[in-house]
């Protein structure tokens, strides 16, 4: 690698636009020349998006917290034969979580993933829970990657296609290519050969020092309205610096993943969807267990086209989700529609079980909290009420797991609790003393916690 590496080339090689300083400050600036206790494992957080609603009749546990009955979509989480152990006793099934702040402003249905970890509608400016924990609360400060933002099938940053949002309301791009994820986690920085590694680090740090100086000067001149963007850039630079300073992982690197002909769903990537999903899960679990990061999100793309995997119906979207006919107090529903939607749900929870299996095999599950949620409850109605929400808690968090919590209330149990309260509770589990989370003109939605999580 050339020792005369420019700032622009350096930042581009690390996935940061070399023009970002000028772009974000155009019009007002000159052109730019948590520590774990001794002996205790650090706490980790993973957020997982589960797509396309749920067949509530087959998602809800039965008496005795039975999640393995015939047809249950949660059965993979209690399948020791397939996944090495049952995760039933680590599980909290939360029925009655509403994406209330989104409902208030119409950020619902397929846009609802915007609300899952932010507790805010489309115009919210707060960070999502993962970024709050990693950046603002600081649990990502000691790892090479402050956080990981992974996806399968879509790298879009549209409102309804992202879980992770930086402060200021900026969506964080997802890494959807396992080969890139592997290179970022286990590859040689900047593509240098092993003998060039130290010179590459020195050159990178030299450029980084100059960019940091540019950023400091711009920040002093910036109007208040631009400070949040500059803070985001400063966070990105700190992450780059950590990665340059970090030595190779002490745990064994997995085998490099293959290159896939196509990566995106809806554009021909469907035949590879299952293999890509498994690789992303395995790399995520390895990153957590190697302490390369302590915070991550995984966005599983909407399963709406044929040929993604053999057991799915031809069109999960129009022919399955939109034809789901729920049972309620005044309507018996259509069991055949539940069974069809349950195929997709069962597949998704099988992938969640794979993630838990990999974390358990690496000894990282006890110190990890996994939050898995979707953007819709009843997909036929595009309803963001009673979204399927699971917490899988390691033993270090002190939650009373292995049970079902029905948080629904009101007429026909049609009302739930705002997901903001769950976000407050999770933040508290990581030692963040917050009493509210998210943004809404209806501030009553934002405050409070779910004391029932502890039993």
Predicted region positions:
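Ligand-binding pockets and gating/stacking loops
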Residues: 2-455
């Amino acid at each position: 690698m050339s020792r005369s590496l420019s700032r622009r080339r350096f930042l581009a090689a690390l996935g940061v636009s070399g023009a970002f300083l000028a772009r974000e400050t155009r019009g007002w600036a000159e052109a730019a020349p948590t520590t774990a206790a001794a002996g205790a494992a650090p706490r980790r957080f993973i957020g997982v998006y589960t797509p396309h609603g749920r067949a509530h009749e087959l998602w809800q546990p039965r008496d005795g917290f039975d999640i393995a009955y015939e047809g249950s979509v949660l059965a993979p989480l209690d399948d020791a034969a397939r996944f090495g152990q049952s995760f039933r006793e680590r599980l909290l099934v939360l029925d009655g979580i509403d994406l209330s702040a989104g409902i208030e402003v119409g950020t619902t249905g397929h846009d609802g993933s915007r609300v899952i970890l932010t507790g805010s509608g489309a115009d919210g400016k707060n960070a999502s829970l993962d970024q709050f924990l990693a950046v603002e609360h600081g649990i990502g400060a000691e790892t090479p990657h402050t956080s990981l933002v992974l996806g399968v099938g879509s790298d879009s940053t549209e409102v309804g296609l992202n879980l992770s949002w930086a402060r200021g309301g900026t969506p964080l791009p997802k890494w959807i290519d396992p080969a890139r994820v592997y290179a970022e986690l286990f590859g040689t920085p900047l593509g240098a050969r092993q003998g060039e590694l130290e010179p590459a680090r020195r050159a990178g740090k030299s450029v980084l020092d100059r960019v940091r100086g540019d950023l400091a000067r711009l920040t002093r001149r910036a109007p208040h309205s631009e400070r949040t963007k500059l803070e985001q850039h400063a966070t990105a630079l700190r992450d780059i610096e950590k990665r340059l300073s970090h030595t190779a992982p002490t745990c064994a690197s997995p085998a490099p993943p293959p290159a896939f002909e196509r990566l995106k769903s809806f554009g021909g990537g469907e035949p590879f969807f299952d293999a890509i999903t498994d690789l992303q899960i395995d790399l995520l679990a390895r990153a957590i267990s190697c302490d390369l990061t302590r915070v991550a999100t995984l966005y599983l793309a909407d399963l709406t086209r044929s040929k993604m995997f053999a057991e799915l119906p031809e069109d999960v979207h129009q022919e399955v989700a939109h034809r789901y006919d729920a049972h309620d107090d005044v309507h018996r529903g259509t069991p055949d529609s539940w069974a069809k939607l349950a195929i997709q749900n069962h597949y998704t929870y099988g992938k969640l079980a794979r993630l838990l299996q990999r974390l358990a095999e690496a000894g990282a599950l006890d110190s990890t909290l996994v939050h898995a949620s979707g953007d819709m409850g009843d997909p036929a109605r595009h309803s963001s009420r009673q979204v399927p929400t699971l917490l899988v808690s390691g033993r270090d968090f002190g939650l009373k797991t292995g049970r079902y919590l029905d948080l629904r209330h009101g007429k026909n149990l049609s009302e739930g609790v705002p997901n903001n309260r769950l976000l407050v509770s999770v933040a508290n589990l990581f030692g963040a003393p917050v009493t509210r989370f998210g943004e809404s003109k209806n501030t009553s939605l934002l405050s409070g916690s779910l004391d029932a999580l502890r039993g």
